[in-house]
A protein has these predicted regions:
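Domain-edge interaction signal
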Residues: 1-155
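Small, basic N-terminal interaction modules of short regulatory proteins
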Residues: 140-191
Length: 191
């Protein structure tokens, strides 16, 4: 079991996939991962409780998780200038982390960070984050209703956890070629 809180684990994992992310992007990655987790797993990955802040979804608990990473030597925080603004660059250190995520959570975290890695913070917010169901119609200061993501579940009934279990089964050699299974069914039908 990890000695990091769940929220710190989420941020650290995202930094492994997207080193150099700033505060805004890091928080938005966590938010989007929680949105996808609600969609496919029916629950969040993190323990963040998002509110509509001045710059979109945010939870002040981010600072505790970030401080936990930096103070514990799991990430670096470097102050930088971005045009006229002060910003921060976060990077994972070489200190190993034992994550408490299941495979579906890992895939969601990786997917979000890789998918939005090249987005600027502005385009990430305007083109993606602000268009998510919890943000639609929300007012500044309100807690976001993350369960609205459940309304956007895959219409085909895609079950991420079952798919990953099947993939692991195939990787472990526990499968039968389709031709073999069909031939067996035909033989049973003829008998």
């Amino acid at each position: 079991m990890s000695n990091l809180s769940r929220n710190a684990q989420v941020l650290r994992y995202l930094l492994e996939v997207a080193p150099g992310a700033g505060r805004i992007k890091l928080v938005k990655y966590a938010y989007l991962a929680d949105c996808e987790a609600y969609r496919y797993l029916g629950r969040a990955i993190s323990g963040f409780r998002y509110r509509f802040d001045n710059h979109g979804p945010f939870d002040r608990a981010f600072f505790d998780a970030k401080d936990e990473l930096v103070d514990g030597g799991y990430a670096t925080e470097t102050a930088i200038r971005i045009g006229p603004y002060d910003g921060y660059d976060y990077r994972p250190t070489n200190q190993s982390v034992e994550y408490g995520f299941n495979q579906a959570e890992v895939e969601i975290l990786r997917y979000v960070a890789q998918t939005y890695l090249n987005e600027t913070a502005i385009s990430l917010c305007e083109d993606v984050v602000y268009k998510t169901p919890p943000m639609k119609g929300a007012k500044v200061g309100e807690r976001l209703k993350m369960d609205r993501m459940k309304e956007e579940q895959d219409p085909l009934g895609f079950d991420l956890e079952r798919l990953l279990e099947a993939e692991a089964s195939v990787d472990a050699g526990r499968y039968r070629p389709v031709k073999e299974a069909v031939d067996e069914l035909r033989a049973r039908h003829r008998a």
